[in-house]
A protein has these predicted regions:
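Extended, charge-enriched "interface" segments that sit outside catalytic cores
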Residues: 1-69, 339-345, 349, 437-447
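Active-site phosphate/pyrophosphate-binding segments
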Residues: 161-324, 415-447
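Helicase-primase coupling helices
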Residues: 299-385
Length: 447
């Protein structure tokens, strides 16, 4: 279960204010639980942990087993935004930090494509595919989103040229709409196996659907434990009490923002395994809250690394932020610092200590320094990093996001702003149907 500690904010806010925002948070909680708020047709994520059928989990595992029998050692997962960040986060968090160099896991390497339009990246992906035994998961509800569609066209061509059309079809799985769209049509024509992106689950809330479950199980991890951890968190957050961690988090972040003008939230971790937790979290909160000229800007750092760069700004820069630290209470590994007879580095005072003890003291020292410097700090903690705790963490942040956005007064489940750049890009690429926009944008650029 995820725990929260808001004590690092207590010297910055009044108790009466926090109680007021707890009341606002409980009102928003009621809206979310009653499914009566804006965007209530996109609440399918709420019960995924408790309602995901065994048949779906087994189907994901069947793909894993089939590709293992085909000796697949590279899976290219194609998707953008919520179609890849959750899976990327889980795989990075659960993998050996040097898995690529060691190649001892027994599971295929999972790489991601379709999340950018870099020609160098795509070209280097082709280089990798030419020397590996490849399969592909393509994730797109429509099949026409530019970045993943471009990547899939290229990967599909490689698979068909390398293995032939029939074998290529066995090496492609599509995660897409149940009934419509270009990718669904192509999958039916070519005979690809398909999984469904539920209509009532938005992309950034989709990590516990096949969008996340399939890549995670292909990477060799236990999606049953992931769902079990999320289910326990679902049950915990269903209890309406002042110890509801999601309510506490949503209340404090909105209090700091609305009353004290803290416009930036920095998600902090003290392990590089959580770098992509920050990326997933930024999309979740940025797209859910950043609209109607409102929102808290989500940023992320990995300490102690970033203490030697952004730490200066956090300590002494503009007082526009607060921190939310994701704490891992116990390490999965054990390394003890040894003694050195010469002690030239003057570290013998640490001899016999675990490296994680040094990390914990760095975390505590940073907390005290940043609070002294005027930066409020919340702490979200899990017992250790594994599939179960990661599932709980995913669900916690998703649920809290819904509550927080309703406090803010915005629809957590739409993202109207992401279409603006696409319209300009289509006009500049002279996509059919955009002739008038092309003419207008060319005139604008010639001024």
């Amino acid at each position: 279960m995820v725990k929260i500690n808001v004590g690092g904010c207590s010297s910055f806010v009044k108790d009466s204010e926090y109680k007021e925002y707890l009341e606002k948070a409980f009102a928003a909680y009621d809206v979310l639980e009653s499914e009566s708020g804006a965007g209530n047709d996109f609440l399918g994520w709420k019960h995924l942990p408790s309602q995901t059928p065994e048949s779906l989990v087994k189907a994901c595992e069947d793909v894993r087993d089939d590709w293992k029998n085909r000796n697949v050692d590279l899976v290219v997962v194609i998707g953008i935004g919520g179609s890849y960040l959750g899976a990327k986060c889980a795989i990075e968090a659960l993998s050996h930090s040097f898995a690529r160099e060691m190649r001892q896991s027994g599971a295929p390497e999972v790489v991601f494509a379709g999340n950018n339009l870099s020609e160098e990246y795509v070209s280097e992906l082709i280089d990798l595919m030419t020397v590996r035994n490849v399969a592909c998961v393509v994730i797109s509800k429509s099949g026409t989103t530019t970045e993943p569609a471009v990547a899939f066209r290229i990967v599909k061509q490689h698979l068909e040229e390398t293995y032939g059309q029939k074998e290529a079809a066995a090496r492609i799985v599509a995660v897409t709409d149940a009934h419509k769209g270009a990718l669904k049509t192509l999958s039916t024509q070519e005979g690809y196996r398909t999984f469904v992106v539920p209509d009532n689950v938005g992309g950034r809330f989709s990590v516990l659907t096949p969008v996340g479950l399939l890549p995670i199980v292909l990477a060799g991890f236990d999606i049953r434990a992931l769902l079990e951890g999320a289910k326990e968190e679902e049950m915990a957050l269903a209890e309406k009490s002042e110890k509801n961690a999601a309510v506490e988090y949503a209340a404090m972040r909105n209090l700091l923002h609305s009353v004290y003008g803290k416009s930036v939230e920095v998600l902090v971790s003290f392990t590089p395994k959580f770098q992509y937790l920050g990326e997933w979290w930024k999309q979740l909160y940025g797209e859910s809250e950043g609209k109607d000229k409102k929102g808290i800007y989500p940023a992320s750092v990995v300490y102690t690394t970033d203490l030697h760069s952004l730490g200066q700004f956090v300590q002494d820069g503009a007082r526009i932020m607060y921190e939310t630290v994701v704490t891992v209470e116990n390490s999965n590994r054990s390394v003890v610092i040894g003694s050195d007879p010469q002690n030239l580095d003057q570290l013998n005072y640490l001899a016999g200590q675990h490296v994680e003890h040094c990390n914990a003291m760095a975390q505590l020292g940073t907390k005290l320094a940043h609070i002294d410097g005027g930066v409020p700090q919340m702490e979200v903690s899990i017992e250790r990093i594994n599939e179960k705790t990661l599932g709980a963490l995913f669900y916690f942040f998703e649920f809290a996001c819904g509550v927080s956005a309703y406090i803010l007064g915005v629809n957590p489940f739409n993202q109207p702003g992401v279409e603006a750049y696409k319209k300009n890009m289509f006009a500049l690429l002279e996509k059919p149907g955009f002739e008038e926009q092309t003419k207008a944008i060319k005139a604008r650029l010639s001024e």
